[in-house]
Amino acid sequence: MLNAVGREIPEEILERTGKEVFQGNNYKDGKAFQKASPKVTPVMRNDHDKMVKDIHEALVKCNAHDGMTVSFHHHFREGDLVVCMVMEEIHKMGFKNITLSASSLGKAHDALVPMIEDGTIVNIESSGVRGKIGDAISHGKLKGLATMRSHGGRVRAIETGETHVDIAFIGAPSCDEYGNCSGMGGKTNCGVLSYAYVDAEMADYVVAVTDCLVDYPNYPAEINQTKVDYVCVVDQIGIPEKIATGAAKPTTDQRKILMAEYCTQVVANTPYFKDGFSYQTGVGGASIASTISLSKIMEEKNIHMGLGVGGLTKPMCELLDRGLARKLVDTQDFDLDAVNNVTSNPNHFPISAGEYASPMNKGAFVNKLDYVILASLEVDTHFNCNVVVGSDGIITGAQGGHPDTAQGAKCTIVIAPLLQGRIPAICTDVTTVTTPGESVDIVVTDYGVAVNPRRPDLLEALKAADCVPLKTIEELRDIAYSIVGEPEKVQFGDRIVGIIEARDGTVMDVVREVKLSLSAKIE
């Protein structure tokens, strides 16, 4: 069946998953639904002990079984040790047919590949995957299905009961003996625990895993004692230098600096740039450089950011500290400065992933964004974006909040160099659609800026300002093809190994097993 972005979704997938095809961004707007009800094991005795000696005991007490769904957050990023620690014990205990539900998976989890191959893990639900897991899925080693969801889409799936989490393991930088968890106060601080809120709320059992047990009560707690069944102390939950790698530095790449300048000019010359505007940006070099250059214009024009949303880095936190931003709401911290700013600035507020981006609540923060600056592996002439599948057909990225913020913001700006190595980033059709073109307003490249024809108001504003070289998206594609030629299409097999969910739970696209790799890599 053809969906709203022109992708053919096989009936077998719709029957297998019970899903509908994507029918546009606002298909489910205003349609009431019934939230799932969590199972709660009450604690009434005042002598109840939540402490367990190890992960093995936690699994036994949580009634671990074949076919269960276990969940994790990814706030420790490439420094995460919790996922592999727990899955190794599950493997050792002989459990099979596990569904692994994580807010994201990366190279830190490469050790899970043998568990995929032997049937310990049969389904994966994640924002996306990087590293060897993505390669394994793309080559058909996962026996079930990989379901890629946005951050908001994951919250929706768990709250509606589509994903039922049997045991949630929440890595906590600090925790007390009764389960009050914080992203701060330990030796592996990650700032916030936003992605784990929904797991703590909805899972049958919740296990806090910490390497820093502190005195009761560990307050303020992001995840409190009323949600946690057991507490397990281990030697190490993360590698600090891989959790937050220090201050993000502005890029010295001249191509990225040029795109950053174009992006800054686009923001500064469109109607939403006025005192009190709201803004979110990514963590790439061009995005960071754009935030820094935008701050200079804000100072010159005495314009203050009313709200910054993130995924946060040092430059955004500096805007807050300098008084150029009034408030930051935080779902993830990407460097040490952002981590520390959580507690050092009283106007820096942790929020849940649901508050941030869920499409199925009564209004998420993404809906109040004026601007969002995003990156993309590919953008096509319909303004569709691909952030998950590489040009070689291998799953190599994650949706993250890309579809959520792109739909929510009044002005969605996507930055992409015209060429990624020898591969055109602007093309006729993306390999896989993750964010629909109806969500994307402006594409910024090093060869010019294209405005979606859906937004004549933005095009007129930029024409009037004469601040950036304007091109059509087709012109940008043609320039790319004239330099490196039109790329060959990846040869996929028939088997579907994954689905790309739209944030409302409908099917945006499918990912097929790679038949022939072109050995073209995104640089």
Where are these regions (language model features)?
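Conserved alpha/beta enzyme-core scaffold
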Residues: 1-523
